């Protein structure tokens, strides 16, 4: 059995080596994401594990099939996969997931530090200003919290929020309740999980108009949910009181890269970052030691199970 791994993180190497000894397979490894230039690495491989691609569409499936690949595991929740194309080329696809606690806890942290003006506190400390008059914060447990989405991360976040005394309402994608009422009632609106229908929940001018003045928005799901020009207008007009985002539209090529010697080409990101009530983190909510080990472990186990003629709970059918 031979497996190919693309977009491999340094964090995954030790765990992958242990799994290789456990399941006894050969491996081909690349730090680069899968592309036409390095596709030949997967020739004669029984399965392929990918991370970091924006989309895996018709051409990708055609290329994989041309090298004899029958089984594919995707380790990145941000990657859009054309499952119908995969079926046309007889490729079975699994998606590794990480435990919900990482994103749920990080989302809570973002909401807390945003409300307690921690960004401003850090700035002031850099110039030895330890006054606190400008740092008066708010208590999250006194806010009406709205959580958008479904799945384990949403459930776990709701559990944690309720545990500290928050009043929480969840608007799932299959709910029939009024989204307008949800917007009007929520003082803090949190997006912790990628949505199947992001257009329905897109935060644009119309959506913001239905929200409370000074609404707190927290997004650890996907940059595509927020219409950035509308978000900028909302911050400038103070319609948005606090904005915290671990994701950003157009983040690929910036987040998870060292850009200390570069000028950022994403002007919206650079502009928003300078506001004292805006917190932007580099898509790190998932990034824990346990999450990284779990991603590669579930990826390998899924491929091995399918190659050996079994089933995987992570297969997308």
Which residues does each predicted region cover?
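Rossmann-like dinucleotide-binding domain for NAD(H)/NADP(H)
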Residues: 214, 223-317
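Rossmann-fold NAD(P) dinucleotide-binding segment
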Residues: 56-68, 198-217
């Amino acid at each position: 059995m031979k497996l190919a791994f693309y977009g491999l993180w340094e964090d995954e190497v030790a765990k992958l080596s242990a799994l290789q000894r456990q399941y006894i397979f050969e491996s081909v490894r690349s730090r680069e994401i899968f592309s036409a230039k390095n596709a030949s690495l997967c020739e004669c491989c029984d399965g392929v594990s990918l991370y970091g691609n924006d989309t895996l569409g018709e051409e990708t499936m055609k290329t994989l099939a041309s090298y004899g690949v029958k089984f594919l595991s995707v380790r990145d929740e941000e990657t859009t996969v054309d499952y119908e194309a995969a079926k046309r080329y007889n490729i079975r696809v699994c998606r590794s997931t990480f435990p919900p606690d990482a994103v749920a806890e990080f989302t809570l942290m973002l909401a807390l530090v945003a409300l307690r003006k921690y960004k401003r506190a850090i700035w002031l400390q850099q110039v030895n200003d330890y006054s606190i008059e400008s740092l008066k914060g708010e208590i999250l447990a006194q806010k009406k919290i709205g959580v958008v989405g479904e799945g384990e991360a949403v459930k776990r976040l709701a559990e944690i929020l309720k545990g500290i005394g928050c009043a929480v309402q969840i608007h799932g994608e299959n709910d029939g309740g009024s989204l307008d009422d949800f917007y009007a009632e929520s003082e803090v609106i949190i997006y912790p999980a990628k949505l199947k229908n992001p257009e329905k929940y897109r935060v644009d001018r119309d959506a913001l108009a239905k929200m409370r003045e000074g609404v707190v928005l927290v997004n650890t799901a996907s940059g595509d949910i927020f219409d950035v020009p509308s978000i900028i207008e909302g911050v400038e007009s103070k319609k948005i009181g606090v904005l915290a985002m671990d994701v950003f539209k157009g983040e690929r090529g910036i987040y998870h890269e060292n850009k200390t010697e570069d000028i950022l080409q994403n002007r919206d990101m650079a502009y928003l970052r300078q506001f004292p009530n805006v917190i932007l983190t580099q898509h790190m909510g998932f990034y824990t030691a346990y999450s990284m080990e779990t991603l590669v472990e579930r990826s390998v186990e899924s491929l091995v199970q399918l190659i050996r003629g079994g089933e995987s709970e992570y297969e997308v059918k």
